[in-house]
Amino acid sequence: MASLKALKVRITSVKSTQKITKAMKMVAAAKLRRAQMAAEAGRPYAERLDAVMSSLASKVTVGPQSPKLLAGTGNDQVHLLVVATSERGLAGAFNTNIVRAARKTADSLIAQGKTVKFYLIGKKGRAVLQRLFPGKIVHQVDQSHIKNVAFSDAHMVAEDLIGRYSAGEFDVAHLFFAKFQSALVQEPTELQIIPVPLTADTGAAATGASAAVEYEPDEEAILTELLPRNVAVQLFRAMLENAASEQGSRMTAMDNATRNAGEMINKLTIQYNRTRQAAITTELIEIIAGAEAL
């Protein structure tokens, strides 16, 4: 049985930890509101741009002269997995879920005989992916200096990715991030960003929504300008979603930790009181026994 001194030290330690987790929860809650508003504000623009891209692409014939970001390389052998995680931990299963989704896709592609490479945004996924896929990480973007995500941050990453794509380093790029649903729910999401995916359904829907629209100059010229921007916009959206998801997950994790600390303090306090009571009882018995001996 633990001594009274040891129990008292442990109770003090848990109370100190509880204060820290409670403070982190409050900070995450304050940041969550701002991050959530930014993520929700960015969705309509990204979705509308995607619809415009589909509308434009449905009006052109994809061929050798089409923009490479639309037509692709003509191959799908080398896949680059762009994994966006956080720079800091203590965010529950936020980073784990994103890495798990990327790992699942990587395993599936490798099983099909494809070559897989990783491009990391944030440092929290590096250790696991380096261990599971040694030598496959081609680059890591350091975001430790970023307090609030800006479009310029996403634009720099987009330029680097497009440059690598143009240089023939990969054929297809998949983006992994956590789509924010609520403080309790963040959905791991995979999105192909290079080449721009255009399904028959989205193309038809976009065509129907903008059937009366005429483009000047021609659609292919506009696509040449918009395709790189679309990559940056999708990256920016993912970063905003990640920022909100990270704070939501951290707030929930710290709330759980605070409540667990409270329960542990209660249990330790009960154990402390019982131990103290037992010690007092033992002393009384010894005093009474000594008195009777006299």
Curated annotation (Swiss-Prot):
It is found in: Cell inner membrane. CDD domains: F1-ATPase_gamma (cd12151). InterPro entries: ATP_synth_F1_ATPase_gsu, ATP_synth_F1_gsu, ATP_synth_F1_gsu_CS. Gene3D superfamilies: 3.40.1380.10, ATP synthase, gamma subunit, helix hairpin domain. One of its GO terms (cellular component) is proton-transporting ATP synthase complex. The keyword Ion transport applies. Produces ATP from ADP in the presence of a proton gradient across the membrane. The gamma chain is believed to be important in regulating ATPase activity and the flow of protons through the CF(0) complex. PANTHER family: ATP SYNTHASE GAMMA CHAIN, ATP SYNTHASE SUBUNIT GAMMA, MITOCHONDRIAL. F-type ATPases have 2 components, CF(1) - the catalytic core - and CF(0) - the membrane proton channel. CF(1) has five subunits: alpha(3), beta(3), gamma(1), delta(1), epsilon(1). CF(0) has three main subunits: a, b and c. This is ATP synthase gamma chain.
